[in-house]
Swiss-Prot record:
Listed GO biological process terms: regulation of cellular defense response; regulation of complement activation, lectin pathway; regulation of innate immune response
Family: Belongs to the fucolectin family.
Tissue expr: Parenchymal hepatocytes.
InterPro entries: BG_Antigen-Binding_Lectin, FTP1, Galactose-bd-like_sf
Protein name, entry field: Fucolectin-3
Single GO MF descriptor: calcium ion binding
Annotated S-S bridges: 73-168, 104-105, 130-146
Keyword Lyase among record annotations: no
PANTHER family: FTP DOMAIN-CONTAINING PROTEIN, SI:CH211-215K15.4
Length: 180
């Protein structure tokens, strides 16, 4: 138990040396997308002719294809939409990478909040904020660095306006010690 605690403290120390605008990975560490291991859900799935393409799990399939009709994007329906991944365990998260829809409606994501925490109260919307998506071009993939490493099991993307939320990939980035 003490060894695990010491390793965790070293991880936090190494991660905290990252600047929020840095894409560098500290020596001796590897970055991994842990969202691929998770389970996704969303506030409400799009209904109608193209509903089959709209599943929450499409945003964690490892495919950054930004064309909604290719079946690799999620799509909510209704106001104040949210999408969430349960990572199934707690991690120290440094950043979240999002791929925006590219074939249409890229502006809809503006104002979305990326929230990370250990609680599901209010569907994770009450968890601390990592970053806000101010603007993203259609089809763009962008990494949002948390101001400091954040500990959490749930990553929620919440769009607090009257608009649907469309995500073509969500990657939750965690640093692990590199194998020797």
């Amino acid at each position: 138990m003490e060894v695990k605690m010491i390793i965790l403290l070293f991880q936090i120390l190494a991660i905290s040396t990252l600047k929020s605008d840095s894409a560098d990975i500290p020596e001796g560490y590897i970055q991994e997308n842990v969202a691929l291991r998770g389970r996704a859900t969303q506030s409400a799935q799009l209904k109608g002719e193209f509903a089959g393409f709209a599943h929450a799990s499409n945003a964690i399939d490892g495919n950054r294809d930004s064309n909604y009709h290719h079946g690799s994007c999620s799509h909510t329906e209704g106001d104040n939409s949210w999408w969430r991944v349960d990572l199934k365990q707690v991690y120290t998260i440094t950043s979240v990478t999002i791929t925006n829809r590219g074939d249409c409606c890229g502006e809809r994501i503006s104002g979305a909040r990326i929230l990370i925490g250990k609680h599901l109260e209010n569907n994770g919307i009450n968890n601390p904020e990592c970053s806000t998506i101010n603007i993203m071009a259609a089809g763009e993939t962008k990494t949002f660095h948390c101001p400091q490493p954040m500990i959490g099991r749930y990553v929620t993307v919440y769009l607090p306006k009257a608009e649907s939320l469309q995500l073509c990939e969500v990657e939750v980035n965690v640093l692990f010690p590199a194998p020797c």
